[in-house]
Structures are given as structure tokens and as C-alpha cells.
Regions:
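Surface-exposed, charged secondary-structure patches
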Residues: 63-126
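Short, low-complexity N-terminal intrinsically disordered segments enriched in polar/charged residues
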Residues: 3-4, 18, 22-54
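Sec-dependent signal peptide hydrophobic core
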Residues: 13-17
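Low-complexity, intrinsically disordered terminal/linker segments enriched in charged
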Residues: 110-114, 118, 123-131, 137-138, ...
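N-terminal export leaders
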Residues: 6-10
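Structured segments of extracytoplasmic/periplasmic soluble domains
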Residues: 39, 43-47, 51, 62-66, ...
């Protein structure tokens, strides 16, 4: 009977992890804009839903490079001044807290690589409509802008 060495176990772990990353990237590239938005918003359903963190891995996966840079710049400026960032809430639900039971998500294709998603929901009695401009790149769909009743995400991030 052959013993599995630690090295073989580690190599097998890396192979599985690499395969998972590759299959996730392939799945993301195959997603429809509606699938992309459904995958985001399912994280916000229910009173104790955690939402999505806006950490580096999430921003890399979800946003276009220019919008990602604006989010990072806002966080850096705030940290430098020891202040709260201009983005002081969750841009996906336009709130700091939420209790959402369901979402009505519709998508309108603008071009083969551009779509606009409209998300309607009730956040504990506050009716909201969020519009997301989506752009497809080689690794899947990304958000290029989010618009709420308060304006665009880029405008909020700039502090204007």
C-alpha cells in the first residue's frame, strides 16, 4: 500500500484549487448579464443577509477597472484623512442596512458587450430602483456604473 506524501497532497490541493479558479472564470465568462446580477443580489435576501464585501477580490471581480480605481481612491483618501469614505453604504442596495425579501431584476441588452440592469426591491418599506451599467470583458460581466435616486456611484465616490 502506497502512502500519500505531504508533497503529493499539497500538489493535489493546488491542482484542485487551480481547477476551481479556472472553472469559476470560465463560468463567469459564460454568464448572462441576468445571471451576473442574480449572483450579486442573492447575497442580500433576508434580514441577516451579509451582502458582498467591497474588498479587493470582490472589486476585481465585479467592477470595471475605472470604477474599481474610483472605489479604491475613495477608500485611500478617507483612510489618509482618518475619515469615513464618500461611499458610506452598500452601492448594491443604496443603504447601510437592509431587510429585503426579493428582487425584481430585468436586463436590457444595449450591444453584444453592454447591458443595463434594473433592480427593484423593497428595503423594509423603502422602495428602491437601482440601475447598473454592465460591460462584458474576456473574463465576464463587470459593473461600469451604478445609479440610484441619489445619483451615480462615480459622483458619490468623487464627493461632488
Amino acid at each position: 500500500m502506497r502512502m500519500i506524501s505531504r508533497r503529493n497532497l499539497i500538489e493535489a490541493g493546488f491542482a484542485v484549487a487551480a481547477g476551481s479558479v479556472i472553472s469559476l472564470a470560465a463560468a463567469a465568462a459564460e454568464q448572462t448579464p441576468k445571471d451576473f446580477l442574480d449572483a450579486i443580489y442573492k447575497n442580500y435576501i433576508g434580514k441577516n443577509a451579509k451582502g458582498l464585501p467591497l474588498d479587493k477580490p470582490a472589486t476585481m471581480r465585479l467592477f470595471t477597472p475605472p470604477l474599481r480605481k474610483a472605489i479604491d481612491d475613495d477608500s485611500r483618501r478617507a483612510a489618509k484623512r482618518n475619515e469615513v469614505p464618500n461611499l458610506d453604504g452598500d452601492p448594491f442596495v443604496d443603504a447601510q442596512d437592509w431587510d429585503i425579501k426579493s428582487f425584481d431584476i430585468s436586463v436590457q441588452d444595449k450591444a453584444p458587450d453592454k447591458s443595463t440592469g434594473t433592480v427593484k426591491f423593497d428595503n423594509d418599506g423603502d422602495k428602491k430602483t437601482i440601475t447598473l451599467d454592465l460591460v462584458k470583458s474576456s473574463d465576464g460581466w463587470h459593473i461600469d456604473e451604478i445609479t440610484t435616486a441619489d445619483g451615480t456611484l462615480r459622483k458619490i465616490l468623487s464627493g461632488k
